[in-house]
């Protein structure tokens, strides 16, 4: 922004005099035609007027008028991209310097008195009601052949429901939920994708940079492919022994113990919310049992011509063992919740 030249000041004086100032001042109404002729947005003109009216009397003396005209011409001629928040020192008249400092001090005090609003964090708990709502959204997405959903399908479904989020919010959340950068994600990560963006839209939560450990395991979970011709079936595990019937029996015992714990927890529970989450856990357990039966059949009827079949079962055994451990941890948490609920009921 070039500094004021003498010819500019003369030009501004001619304009100022033509407005017929009263007591060496012009009002906002007198300057209004000049403001409108600039074709600048009203928000820009208001900011220029605020900066120029240093003594805040809704009138401009000649020194203030010079400031107003210079900022308008700089914006019109694109010498500056935006109106500055504060006047540059070379544009501040010497007679107004004290007023400028007082205005800046008052502004700082005003900002200090305004309490800062903390941005809330994402609450990753999905209630049964939330789950039902997210399932309805997912039902509108066109799933892939393997049941997964793409970013394009999810973002298209959410654009018509969440109006306070942009593409950048969706992309950041997608990278968070999909750390392996897969072309599509499973149903569970997709629900957390919707859950995070819903809170961003409704209450302005910040999108975190990383997931909680338990949720990270869900989003990083290796997909189980049942197609023996897939690439996953060809993976080599040099440090893994071939599975035996003892391995399957051991896994079956763990599943039986887990099912027994779930039944005990269900019998003693007094919370409808807890009942809902236990039902979800039972559904997962039934899926594991079905997969166990599938693997037992593979072991009882092996295909001698396919080494991929053996490696496939080995991979799945390791995968299910990890998920059983996660469910046991989950059960322990629910037992603690049940104990708290019983204590509350006993104290009433």
From Swiss-Prot:
Source taxon at top rank: Eukaryota
Chief localization: membrane
Domain EF-hand: 40-75, 146-164
Stretches that traverse the bilayer: none
Protein name: Actin cytoskeleton-regulatory complex protein END3
S-S bridge residues: none
SUPFAM superfamilies in UniProt: EF-hand
């Amino acid at each position: 922004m070039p500094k004021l030249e003498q010819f500019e000041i003369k030009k501004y004086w001619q304009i100022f005099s033509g407005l017929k100032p009263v007591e060496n001042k012009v009002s906002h109404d007198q300057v209004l035609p000049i403001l409108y002729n600039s074709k600048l947005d009203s928000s820009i003109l208001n900011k220029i007027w605020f900066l120029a009216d240093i003594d805040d009397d809704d009138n401009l003396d000649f020194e203030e008028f010079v400031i107003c005209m210079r900022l308008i011409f700089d914006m019109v001629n694109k010498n500056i991209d935006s109106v500055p928040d504060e006047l540059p020192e070379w544009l501040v008249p010497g007679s107004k310097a004290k007023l400028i400092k007082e205005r800046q001090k008052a502004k700082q005090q005003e900002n200090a008195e305004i309490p800062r609003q903390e941005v809330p964090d994402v609450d990753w708990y999905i209630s049964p009601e939330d789950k039902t709502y997210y399932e309805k959204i997912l039902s509108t997405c066109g799933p892939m052949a393997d049941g997964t959903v793409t970013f394009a399908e999810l973002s298209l479904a959410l654009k018509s429901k969440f109006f306070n989020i942009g593409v950048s919010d969706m992309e950041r959340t997608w990278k968070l939920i999909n750390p392996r950068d897969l072309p599509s994600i499973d149903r569970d990560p997709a629900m957390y994708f919707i859950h995070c963006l819903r809170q961003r839209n409704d209450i302005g939560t910040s999108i975190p940079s990383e997931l909680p450990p338990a949720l990270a395991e869900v989003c990083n979970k290796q997909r189980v492919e049942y197609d023996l011709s897939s690439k996953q079936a060809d993976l080599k595990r040099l440090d893994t022994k071939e599975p035996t019937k003892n391995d399957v029996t051991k896994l079956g015992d763990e599943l039986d113990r887990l099912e027994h714990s779930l039944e005990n927890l269900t019998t003693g529970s007094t919370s409808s919310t807890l009942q809902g989450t236990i039902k979800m856990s039972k559904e997962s357990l039934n899926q594991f049992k079905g997969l166990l039966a599938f693997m037992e059949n593979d072991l009882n009827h092996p295909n001698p011509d396919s080494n991929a079949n053996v490696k496939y079962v080995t991979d799945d055994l390791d995968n299910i063992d990890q998920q059983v451990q996660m469910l046991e941890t989950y059960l322990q948490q629910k037992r603690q919740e049940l104990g708290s609920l019983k204590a509350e009921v006993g104290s009433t």
